[in-house]
């Protein structure tokens, strides 16, 4: 089934200048970039986007990291886009990520792990709406 999902290329990947390589992974695996923008998240936006993690011990570090530099936010579209994106990203901890996944190849740590991807179709809809107006899609 054709789906849309949200992907964020995080500050660590932008600092390493691997944005193009990451986008190529998506495109060469059947995911089309249908919307994209580069921005610098405010603390408030980062806190709102990651509100589900507010009570978790890593929340403060996550927010500090996500506002430490610019990010690239994209809507990816393709067959089973949510699952395909998650497979391409690899495990949250790059040390556990399968060889050839984005996190295994470009991430440094569980915190600086290069990319974010929606974990369900419902969350994909909500996350896309957080960053993109319907007219932009």
From Swiss-Prot:
Recorded GO MF terms: ATP binding; metal ion binding; nucleoside diphosphate kinase activity
Reactions the enzyme catalyzes: a 2'-deoxyribonucleoside 5'-diphosphate + ATP = a 2'-deoxyribonucleoside 5'-triphosphate + ADP; a ribonucleoside 5'-diphosphate + ATP = a ribonucleoside 5'-triphosphate + ADP
An example Gene Ontology CC term for this record: cytoplasm
InterPro entries: NDK-like_dom, NDK-like_dom_sf, Nucleoside_diP_kinase, Nucleoside_diP_kinase_AS
Assigned EC number: 2.7.4.6
Entry's localization field: Cytoplasm
Active-site residues per Swiss-Prot or TrEMBL entry: 116 (pros-phosphohistidine intermediate)
Keywords attached to this entry: ATP-binding, Cytoplasm, Kinase, Magnesium, Metal-binding, Nucleotide metabolism, Nucleotide-binding, Phosphoprotein, Transferase
CC cofactor: Mg(2+)
Protein name: Nucleoside diphosphate kinase
Binding site for ATP: 10, 58, 86, 92, 103, 113
Enzyme class (EC, first level): transferase
Organism: Helicobacter pylori (strain P12)
């Amino acid at each position: 089934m054709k789906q849309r999902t949200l992907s964020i290329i995080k500050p660590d990947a932008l600092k390493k200048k691997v944005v193009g390589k990451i986008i190529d992974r998506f495109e060469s695996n059947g995911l089309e970039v249908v919307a994209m923008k580069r921005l610098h998240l405010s603390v408030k936006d980062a806190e709102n986007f990651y509100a589900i993690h507010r009570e978790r011990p890593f929340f403060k570090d996550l927010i500090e990291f996500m506002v430490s530099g610019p990010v690239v936010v994209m809507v990816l579209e393709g067959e089973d886009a949510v699952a395909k994106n998650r497979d391409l990203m690899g495990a949250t901890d790059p040390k556990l990520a399968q060889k050839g996944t984005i996190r295994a190849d470009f991430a440094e740590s569980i915190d600086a792990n290069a990319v974010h991807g929606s974990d369900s179709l419902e969350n994909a809809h909500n996350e896309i709406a957080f960053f993109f107006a319907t007219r932009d899609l």
